């Protein structure tokens, strides 16, 4: 075991641990893994299928193939404080400072019926300084540029065709060239090519029966339109969060960056079961047609019209049942992020949980040392798997926005729960926990005894 501990804030000299790591996929999970492993002194080489990163791309999903893809299609992502405090340590606060303009500021969500009548207000607890509501592509771009500044070897346009391991090493094959390291971190998203190597269970993503229209509107165009600019009212002080509830569709319009961007989403029944792509380009008219009978359509339509067709998608909500293991047979490869536990984008925790995986893994590698790589990977799984699985199975967080079966006749009869912000989720510091618990976890693994995590809710659900 490593004798000295860097602690959550500590950074080692580059390549000082003697541990070599391959990262496959450069989404939120992969970028965080590359950066955190570098911080803890591990040697990192990362591979990404896409060829380049658009300099001002504003869009992407937690799948790496979309985070770094074409510019401008886009919407938002919430990073809870459990994730924000991880990148808050990077670059002496430089990454945190770069994201400060995108802090999460709404204090409540205003809920309306299909006629546009105000029904209720759902309180959003005051966000900590390390919670962010930002554009997905901007977050990925910021992480990528920080990784570049650290000199991390990131090879774009590299399609991995094979994974392999034995008791001593693990590696990949990229276009016929063989690479090896002490371990391979598989962060290749919900459509992971590596997942089938870890489990005999059916690990393919399946459709949930729901889908979401998603897109980013042009804020400058909205300002110029008298019928649309209502959404920017009061955004000089706080962002706006508007929800319009119908029986078969729920429309959400949110501003972020104090009105710098306006994003629109609409959860609806998934009627396109034959389509199996990650996302489907859609026309804003598809959304407007779904609310054609709503009296408040005239309020929503001017904003939706500001979303160009090439920035508008219909995103099927895919899921994967919790896996039986994240670690490969020889203990030299591990799944993290969406490859291990995909979340619905409505959960508000997909990105943060991926970051927790990456940060804990880097620490476990540090504490186990080069001679105990399988122990490090199994310890990461022990610390992270139960926590991620509880969140993955929790319907409040896995589905997020629920379609309303029927609205009450008046706002007085409507009971709307506040947004659930649970201390055990957002106030958790995964890095401190990993340092505190590693010895107990390692002992349990080596002795074959049970490890009971306490990074879960008290009732375990």
From Swiss-Prot:
Active site: 214
Reported cofactor(s): FAD
InterPro entries per record: FAD-bd, FAD-dep_Monooxygenase_BioMet, FAD-dep_OxRdtase_2_FAD-bd, FAD/NAD-bd_sf
Domain of life: Eukaryota
Enzyme class: oxidoreductase
Keywords: FAD, Flavoprotein, Monooxygenase, Oxidoreductase
Pathway(s) the chain acts in: Secondary metabolite biosynthesis
UniProt-listed Enzyme Commission number(s): 1.-.-.-
KW rRNA processing (keyword) present: no
GO MF annotations, alphabetized: FAD binding; monooxygenase activity
Residue sites binding FAD per the record: 48, 136, 338, 351
Free-text function comment from the UniProt entry: FAD-dependent monooxygenase; part of the gene cluster that mediates the biosynthesis of the indole diterpenes nodulisporic acids (NA). Nodulisporic acid A (NAA) and its chemically modified derivatives are of particular significance because of their highly potent insecticidal activity against blood-feeding arthropods and lack of observable adverse effects on mammals, in particular the tremogenicity associated with the paspaline-derived IDTs is not observed.
Protein family (similarity comment): Belongs to the paxM FAD-dependent monooxygenase family.
PANTHER family given in the database record: MONOOXYGENASE (PTHR13789), MONOOXYGENASE, PUTATIVE (AFU_ORTHOLOGUE AFUA_6G12060)-RELATED (PTHR13789:SF236)
Protein name: FAD-dependent monooxygenase nodY2
Organism: Hypoxylon pulicicidum
Gene: nodY2
């Amino acid at each position: 075991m490593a004798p000295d501990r860097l602690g959550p804030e500590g950074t080692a000299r580059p390549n000082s641990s003697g541990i070599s790591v391959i990262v496959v996929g450069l989404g939120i999970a992969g970028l965080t893994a590359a950066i955190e492993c570098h911080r803890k002194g591990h040697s990192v080489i990362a591979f990404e299928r896409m060829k380049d990163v658009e300099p001002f791309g504003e869009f992407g999903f937690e799948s790496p193939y979309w985070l770094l893809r074409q510019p401008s299609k886009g919407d938002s992502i919430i990073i809870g404080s459990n994730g924000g405090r991880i990148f808050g340590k990077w670059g002496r606060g430089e990454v945190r400072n770069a994201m400060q303009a995108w802090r999460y500021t709404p204090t409540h969500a205003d809920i309306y019926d299909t006629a546009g009548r105000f029904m209720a207000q759902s309180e959003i607890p005051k966000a900590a300084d390390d919670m962010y509501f930002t554009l997905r592509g901007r977050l990925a771009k910021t992480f990528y540029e920080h990784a570049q500044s650290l000199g991390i070897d990131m090879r774009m346009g590299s399609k991995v065709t094979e994974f392999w391991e034995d008791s001593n090493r693990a590696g990949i094959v990229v276009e016929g060239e063989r690479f090896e390291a002490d371990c391979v971190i598989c962060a290749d998203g919900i459509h992971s090519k590596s997942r089938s190597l870890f489990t005999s269970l059916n690990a393919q993503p399946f459709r949930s029966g729901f889908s979401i229209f998603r897109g980013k509107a042009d804020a400058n165009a909205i300002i110029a339109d008298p019928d649309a600019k209502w959404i920017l009212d009061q955004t000089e002080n706080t962002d706006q969060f508007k929800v319009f509830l119908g029986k078969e569709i729920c429309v959400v319009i949110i501003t972020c960056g104090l009105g710098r961007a306006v994003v629109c989403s609409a959860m609806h029944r998934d009627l396109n079961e034959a389509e199996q792509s990650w996302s489907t380009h859609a026309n804003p008219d598809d959304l407007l047609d779904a609310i054609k009978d709503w009296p408040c359509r005239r309020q929503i339509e001017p904003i939706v019209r500001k979303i160009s067709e090439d920035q508008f998608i219909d995103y099927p909500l895919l899921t994967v049942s919790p896996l039986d293991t994240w670690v490969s047979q020889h203990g030299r490869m591990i799944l993290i992020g969406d490859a291990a536990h995909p979340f619905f984008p409505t959960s508000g925790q997909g990105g943060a949980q991926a970051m927790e995986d990456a940060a804990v893994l880097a620490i476990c590698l540090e504490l186990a040392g080069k001679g105990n790589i399988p122990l490090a990977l199994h310890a990461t799984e022990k610390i992270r798997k139960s926590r991620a699985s509880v969140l993955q199975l929790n319907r409040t967080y896995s589905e997020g926005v629920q379609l309303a079966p029927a609205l009450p006749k008046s706002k007085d009869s409507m009971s709307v729960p506040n947004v659930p912000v649970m201390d055990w989720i957002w106030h958790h510091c995964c890095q401190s926990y990993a340092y505190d618990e590693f010895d107990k976890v390692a002992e349990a693994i080596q002795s074959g005894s049970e490890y009971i995590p306490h990074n879960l809710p008290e009732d375990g659900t």
